[in-house]
Design a protein with these regions (language model features):
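Metal-dependent nucleotidyltransferase catalytic core
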Residues: 2-8, 47-89
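Active-site nucleotide-donor binding segment shared across nucleotidyl transfer reactions
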Residues: 4-57, 235, 240, 246-247
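Generic structural motif recognizing short loop/turn segments at the entrances and edges of beta-strands
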Residues: 18-21, 41-43, 62, 83-85, ...
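Surface-exposed beta-strand edges and their flanking turn/coil or helix-capping segments
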Residues: 37, 60-61, 118-120
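Catalytic cores of NTP-dependent nucleotidyl/adenyl transfer enzymes across multiple folds
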Residues: 82-247
Length: 247
């Protein structure tokens, strides 16, 4: 993690030494699930709610102050939740170009993911950005369920909803489909152009995989709607949402 600099590296080392559960989220998770994003060096972690205060205390001991909106503009869906604790990795003051690098911690309860759904990262797979050795990750079914439940909790025009739906469609697309070419079936099946046999077979395999996911009993609807999306019966906009306009 040499790209982080001494301060952020020390902070993550202290969190590891304090047995803080760090679960990758946002960019690094999407990359691990196959979505070929270009990381800018930011790190995002889910933390058990009961440990988030400890994260802030350790950060303060090391001289870190939370970055507020006037210093660090919220860009990623998890930041727009209003629950993220954010720290600047760099001391740069530019406000143009790529988003400034950030170290972000978020309560796990926002995603609905529980500690028994996460798994350790067992090998150094060379993915970037590099993470602490003790970091955990989220398997595809649990990640997709989290994206869907977050989207369902938000109002239809919410930036958070739009962001997590994009993440949901992207990780499924790159995990379950051959994205080396542009298929027309990713969300809406065309009315005037039949699918090729290869595309039909790919959809069948993806649907079979989604149906095999072990989700919570009260969240079987997530599998049902994803199957409907990839068989052309629905679109991602049909995911449930909260009622009322977004302020």
């Amino acid at each position: 993690m040499s790209d982080l600099g001494d301060g952020a590296t020390r902070l993550l080392a202290r969190l590891e030494a304090s047995a803080i559960l760090l679960v990758e989220w946002e960019t690094s998770l999407q990359i691990r699930l196959g979505y070929p994003l270009a990381p800018n060096g930011s790190r995002f972690f889910l933390v058990p709610d009961a440990q988030l205060r400890k994260v802030q205390d350790i950060a303060a001991e090391l001289g870190f102050s939370p970055a507020h909106e006037d210093v660090l503009r919220s860009v990623y869906p998890c930041e727009l939740s209003g629950l993220a604790v954010r720290y600047l990795i760099d001391d740069t003051t530019y406000d143009q170009g790529p988003p400034r690098r950030r170290l972000v911690f978020l309560p796990m309860s926002w995603t609905g993911i529980t500690s028994d759904e996460v798994v350790p990262i067992l090998v150094d797979d060379g993915l970037q950005p590099a993470l602490p050795p003790s970091a955990w990750t989220v398997p595809l079914p649990a990640a997709c369920a989290a994206f869907a439940r977050i989207a369902a909790r938000e109002k239809r025009t919410s930036p958070v909803r739009n962001g997590v739906i994009e993440q949901l469609s992207s990780v499924i697309g790159y995990s379950l489909f051959d994205m080396s070419y542009e298929g027309d079936y990713m969300e809406d099946l065309p009315n005037d152009q039949p699918l090729s046999e290869d595309e039909k077979l790919e959809i069948e395999r993806a649907v079979k995989e989604i149906k095999s996911w072990k989700l919570r009993k009260d969240e079987e609807w997530i599998k049902d709607i994803l199957v409907d999306i990839y068989t052309g019966k629905k679109t991602f906009s049909d995911l449930p949402c909260a009622k009322g306009p977004t302020l």
